[in-house]
């Protein structure tokens, strides 16, 4: 399959984006943790001040999925700021359906993300990869990615909504 197109997502792609988010979550054994809705995606990504940006990989009709989907991959990203090095592109989610891997779709998405990062004068792209996900780790390392967990000793933390509410209410 030589034909596919990488393009910015539109509001009409939200159902496909959610479908792929759920497929990625299933791949990562976290399917039950997706609570996001299509409405959330629409409001959060396509309003006046979008919280995220998204690229999608689209194949022509002769390569649609058996279920009739033309969108077979996506990358969700946003911009953040590091006070030491400046602007960063943060890659939140990146997924290509298993039947469509090995055709250069993932590489082309990453190329497009790199072009976006350079156009916006970002100093780097950051992302997380599950420790067990060797195929993805190798995919990124082949393209020059560094593992900051092992090289710099950073640890990822989160504060859940319950605790955010508690701290926000403190007097």
Curated annotation (Swiss-Prot):
> Which keywords appear in this protein's UniProt record, sorted alphabetically?
Acyltransferase, Cytoplasm, Transferase
**Which chain regions cross the lipid bilayer?**
none
N-acetyltransferase domain location: 4-170
Any one of the GO CC terms: cytosol
A GO molecular function annotation here is: spermidine binding
Q: Name one Pfam family in it.
A: Acetyltransf_1
PROSITE patterns tied to this protein? GNAT
Main location as per UniProt:
cytoplasm
Assembly with partners or alone = Homodimer.
Q: What is this protein called?
A: Diamine acetyltransferase 1
Origin species? Mus saxicola
- Which gene underlies this protein? Sat1
